[in-house]
Amino acid sequence: MSLRRHIGNPEYLMKRIPQNPRYQHIKSRLDTGNSMTKYTEKLEEIKKNYRYKKDELFKRLKVTTFAQLIIQVASLSDQTLEVTAEEIQRLEDNDSAASDPDAETTARTNGKGNPGEQSPSPEQFINNAGAGDSSRSTLQSVISGVGELDLDKGPVKKAEPHTKDKPYPDCPFLLLDVRDRDSYQQCHIVGAYSYPIATLSRTMNPYSNDILEYKNAHGKIIILYDDDERLASQAATTMCERGFENLFMLSGGLKVLAQKFPEGLITGSLPASCQQALPPGSARKRSSPKGPPLPAENKWRFTPEDLKKIEYYLEEEQGPADHPSRLNQANSSGRESKVPGARSAQNLPGGGPASHSNPRSLSSGHLQGKPWK
């Protein structure tokens, strides 16, 4: 009798698919859950980019947490500036409205005030700046150097200083770059102060006024960073031993920061040690040579474009777990449309489920209360 023979060669099932080295660095976007391979990759990344030690005195701050803190501080500062500008405009409008009746009264009395009032004495003119003011030059205006031509020009607006060239007011964190001055001028995080680690070895005045102001202050922290945690860990340990309790070190330094946030947070040209190595066989390796590195700008605040880039990379880093997919959003919207009273209930204040809104608008309510306090 003939035995039953399988159709095809069973060795084809054991044959492995050949891998292309050009696309070896590309990882799958599909989350298949925890695995031993992911665990070993995470351990290798920690050993490569982080320098964890036992019994660390200082606390660590993740790069993503630092980016979220920057977005909150920048949003709160912009809201405060808008409110201040509106208040200034309202006060100017009130002043102009209040000056119109005075001008009409002065024109009606020909600049002499009410007929029944006695003319003030010269001493009253000098002591009281507002006594007997008219469209003509008074004694006080002559003394102070104000003439009729100056009055006709109207109030001169004072030139406001460029607030964007200064650090954020009432900032909850103090960012210190512990590298040398040359490295700081080449590249640093926006809003960081240069504080070389050699400054800690000074016998007299090792700390600046800003550091003393933020030391153990309620609702404020001090953040140290460098390229790869070599200097920052030493400086953080020394400062914690000297009584700093609100000290944090940026985990990974500029090396991890440049990998997760290539744009928006850093000004200047990154050093070669912090730049991510190109994978073998990639097309970018044959690009034209770059020019000389650009120095860092004297930049203290983030522009709206920088904040958009930070938010984009932050969403990419958080992954699809925190952000629902388009399919889930479409299914949820389809379910809401089937319910007849769903949309009407959403329009009522405090009634029905909350609709999907912008995360930036959701965080604005928390910003008013300063969540870092």
UniProtKB/Swiss-Prot annotation:
Location of Phosphothreonine modifications: 109
Residue segments, region Disordered: 89-137, 275-373
Localisation per UniProt entry: Cytoplasm, Cytoskeleton, Microtubule organizing center, Centrosome; Cell projection, Cilium; Cytoplasm, Cytoskeleton, Cilium basal body
SMART domains, A to Z: RHOD
GO cellular component: centriole; centrosome; ciliary basal body; cilium; cytosol; membrane
Residue span(s) of domain Rhodanese: 169-266
Residues where Omega-N-methylarginine is found: 343
Organism domain of life: Eukaryota
Family annotation (InterPro entries): CEP41, Rhodanese-like_dom, Rhodanese-like_dom_sf
Written domain comment of the UniProt record: Although it contains a rhodanese domain, does not display phosphatase activity, suggesting that the protein is enzymatically inactive.
Recorded disease: Joubert syndrome 15: An autosomal recessive disorder presenting with cerebellar ataxia, oculomotor apraxia, hypotonia, neonatal breathing abnormalities and psychomotor delay. Neuroradiologically, it is characterized by cerebellar vermian hypoplasia/aplasia, thickened and reoriented superior cerebellar peduncles, and an abnormally large interpeduncular fossa, giving the appearance of a molar tooth on transaxial slices (molar tooth sign). Additional variable features include retinal dystrophy, renal disease, liver fibrosis and polydactyly. Genetic variations in CEP41 may be associated with susceptibility to autism.
Name of the protein in question: Centrosomal protein of 41 kDa
Native organism: Homo sapiens (Human)
